[in-house]
Structures are given as C-alpha cells and as structure tokens.
C-alpha cells in the first residue's frame, strides 16, 4: 500500500484557532502533542499534530489509518478522538492542505510511564489490579473489533485525574483478519517499541494477531512493580537474548514448530539451556502469587499458548483479595500532570541477573521511536 493517500479531504474541519496551546507534552518521529484548551468553554484537550513531511505527495496513509481506527473505537478505556482541526495557511505545491492538521483528543492528566517515573507515586496491589483490569478491558474491546494496537508500552497508557485508563497512540494500529489462504497475512513485523516487542515479531513473524499486544501487557504489568521496563535490549538480537534469559530458551519443545517456521531462528545465536525464570526473577518485586502467575501467562514464548485478554480478565488475580480499587483518591494527592516526555529518564537495571557488560541507551522517546516502522 502506498505511504500516502491522495483521496483525503477535510472540508468540514474546524479552525485550529478555537484552541489555545498550553504546553508541549509529547515529542517523537510521529510529531508533537500539546495540552490545550478550548477558548470558549475552557475544556482541556490534547492536540496531536499530523506529521506532513512530504505533503505534496498526499495525506499520509498511516495518519489516515489512525483516524479511521479512532473513529471506529468508542470505549471507556480507549482514548477519545473529538475532532480534526487545521490551521489556516496558503496552499502551495508543497502543502496542498493549506496548513497543519491536528487530531483533537480528550485530555488525560497522566501517562503510566510518567507516573512510574515518580517515586512519590505509589500503587497499592488493589490499584495495580484496577490498572491492569482497565488495560485488558481496552485490549479485549479493540481485539473484538479486529484492531491490533501494535505499540503497547507504558507511555501509551493514559490515565485521567479520575483514575480512568485509556489506551492511546494508535499510530501503528491496524485492522487484522484471519488468513484466507495458506500463505497467511503479510503484516510488517517492524512494529512495537523494541523493549515491548514479542519474540514472534523479533523472529520475523508477519502473520500475527492479538497475542502481540498481550505480550506488551505482560511487560507493562511487571513494570507496575519494577518501575522500569524489564527487558531493555539494544538490538533485536539482544532483546531475544534477554527474553530467553527470562522466559527460557526458545525451543521446539516449548514452542512447537519454531525451528521450521522462522528462518531467523537458525541464523541467530540464541541462548541454549536457559530455564524459565519469570516467577523467580520477579518475586523480589511481586509478592502476590496470583500476580506472578498472570505475568507468567502473559509472557509465554509461543503466541498460540499466550493467555488472551478474555481469560486474563477472568484470572484469579482480579477475583481475590484485595479486590481492584479506584485510582481517584491516590491520584488526587498529585496536583501536577506526569508524562514520560516531561519526566527524567526512569531508573534502569532493576531486574537482577541482567548482563552487566551491555551498553544500554536511555529509555528516551527518541530511542523508543527509532523502531517505529510502518
């Protein structure tokens, strides 16, 4: 499919001037995100600028896909697209849209990465249960509507001041379907920020589905206790090595057919003889046995055996004491917004037994965005 789509027009877009920018809260290769307010009503919104690097070639197909998906998805745990606005400008051969295009969203006060970067923000077990319940509920909804998020990470999980979680940044999302022939689907595998990328994508899988998002959910769930990403690889090979060291060696015994399905499996030098250590490595942080068990089921190497969102929501973790509890009271003690973009880099190397000689890059937005390939 072409990277740009010429047939898009926005004749009924409101003028951007109805909003006043207040602060920049996000930055990446996708563009910029601003906190803003409606000049008349005072309503707070988030403005995401559509990156138009080569506007003369047409409207970016990736932005169009994001807009179409956001217009389809309406759920309490998915960010709400209010409207599309544009600035005034003169049409030229380089800018047929006469200015900039902005996506306007309901404003959320925090993202999960920003909250976890603040040592003063402390989640109780009951509050972690509520976070994961809302996250999995959002995934259940989008997967039921045949949408893959494809960029699950803590920075893309927004939380309002009232404690409502919203899955956000659908810039990499796409519709999926069951393969109609023996050749399967041919989706790009260069999706998902590296530290949250599941083993099947790292091995070159192109016919994938909802399990890729559930792997990210498992990484995020563990992060609720470790406070930083649990597998911080520098390269795809390094990421697979870290996965093997935590989840056990990738073999046909635990993942039937892996040796025949993926050409990369034979080419990569993956650790041999590694035992699965998810529970052992995390038990220093995660004291609840049900939580450990759910993380273990989310971080299963074989996507066919990985727990889905429906079964995850029915896991004993959510139905044992303490029951999930509202986040509003805890968040009410914090008066400032917390976003990854505005926070100092999070502490690193929390997980024990990480290789000591690896040179790791900070978990900055630019690092995570490096892997965004459409």
UniProtKB/Swiss-Prot annotation:
One of its GO terms (molecular function) is RNA polymerase II CTD heptapeptide repeat kinase activity. It catalyses: L-seryl-[protein] + ATP = O-phospho-L-seryl-[protein] + ADP + H(+); L-threonyl-[protein] + ATP = O-phospho-L-threonyl-[protein] + ADP + H(+); [DNA-directed RNA polymerase] + ATP = phospho-[DNA-directed RNA polymerase] + ADP + H(+). Keywords: ATP-binding, Cytoplasm, DNA damage, DNA repair, Kinase, Nucleotide-binding, Nucleus, Serine/threonine-protein kinase, Transcription, Transcription regulation, Transferase. ATP binds at residues 25-33, 48. Residues 345-374 are annotated as: Disordered. It is found in: Nucleus; Cytoplasm; Nucleus, PML body. It comes from the Eukaryota. PROSITE patterns: PROTEIN_KINASE_ATP, PROTEIN_KINASE_DOM, PROTEIN_KINASE_ST. SUPFAM superfamilies: Protein kinase-like (PK-like). GO terms for cellular component: cytoplasm; nucleus; PML body. Disruption phenotype: Morpholino knockdown of the protein causes in larvae causes high levels of lethality. Its EC number is 2.7.11.22, 2.7.11.23. GO terms for biological process: cardiac muscle tissue regeneration; cell population proliferation; DNA repair; inflammatory response to wounding; positive regulation of protein localization to chromatin; positive regulation of transcription by RNA polymerase II; positive regulation of transcription elongation by RNA polymerase II; protein-containing complex assembly. Residues 19-318 form the Protein kinase domain. Residues 354-368 have a biased composition (Polar residues). The active site is at residue 151. The keyword Coiled coil does not apply. Component of the super elongation complex (SEC). Associates with ccnt1/cyclin-T1, ccnt2/cyclin-T2 or ccnk/cyclin-K to form active P-TEFb. Protein kinase involved in the regulation of transcription. Member of the cyclin-dependent kinase pair (CDK9/cyclin-T) complex, also called positive transcription elongation factor b (P-TEFb), which facilitates the transition from abortive to productive elongation by phosphorylating the CTD (C-terminal domain) of the large subunit of RNA polymerase II (RNAP II) polr2a, supt5h and rdbp. This complex is inactive when in the 7SK snRNP complex form. Regulates cytokine inducible transcription networks by facilitating promoter recognition of target transcription factors. Belongs to the protein kinase superfamily. CMGC Ser/Thr protein kinase family. CDC2/CDKX subfamily. This is Cyclin-dependent kinase 9.
């Amino acid at each position: 499919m072409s990277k740009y789509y010429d047939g898009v027009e926005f004749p009924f877009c409101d003028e951007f001037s109805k909003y006043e920018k207040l602060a920049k809260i996000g930055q990446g290769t996708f563009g910029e995100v601003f906190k803003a307010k409606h000049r008349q009503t005072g309503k707070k919104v988030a403005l995401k600028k559509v990156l138009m690097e080569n506007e003369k070639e047409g409207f970016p197909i990736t932005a169009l896909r994001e807009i179409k998906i956001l217009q389809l998805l309406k759920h309490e745990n998915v960010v709400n697209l209010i409207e599309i606005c544009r600035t005034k400008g003169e049409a030229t051969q380089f800018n047929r849209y006469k200015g900039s295009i902005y996506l306007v969203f309901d404003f959320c006060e925090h993202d999960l990465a920003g909250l976890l970067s603040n040592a003063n923000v402390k989640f109780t077990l009951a509050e972690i249960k509520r976070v994961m319940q809302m996250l999995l509920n959002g995934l259940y909804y989008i997967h039921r509507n045949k949408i893959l998020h494809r960029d699950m990470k803590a920075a893309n999980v927004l939380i309002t001041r009232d404690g409502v979680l919203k899955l956000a940044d659908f810039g990499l999302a796409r519709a999926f379907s069951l393969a109609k022939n023996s050749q399967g689907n041919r989706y790009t595998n260069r999706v998902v920020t590296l530290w949250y990328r599941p083993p099947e994508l790292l091995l070159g899988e192109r016919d994938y589905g909802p399990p890729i998002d559930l792997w990210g959910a498992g990484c995020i769930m563990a992060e609720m206790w470790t406070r930083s990403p649990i597998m911080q690889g520098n390269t795809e090979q390094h990421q697979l090595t870290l996965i093997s060291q935590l989840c056990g060696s990738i073999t046909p015994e635990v993942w039937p057919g892996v040796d025949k399905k993926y050409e990369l499996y034979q080419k990569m030098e993956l650790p041999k003889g590694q035992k699965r250590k998810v529970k052992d490595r995390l038990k220093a942080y995660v004291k609840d046995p049900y939580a450990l068990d759910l993380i273990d089921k989310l971080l299963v190497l074989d996507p066919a055996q990985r727990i889905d969102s429906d079964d995850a929501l029915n896991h004993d973790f959510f139905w044992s004491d303490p029951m999930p509890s509202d986040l509003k009271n805890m968040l009410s003690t914090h008066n400032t917004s917390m976003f990854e973009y505005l926070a100092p880099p999070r502490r690193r190397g929390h997980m024990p037994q990480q290789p000591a000689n690896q040179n790791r890059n900070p978990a900055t937005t630019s690092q995570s965005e490096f892997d965004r390939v459409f």
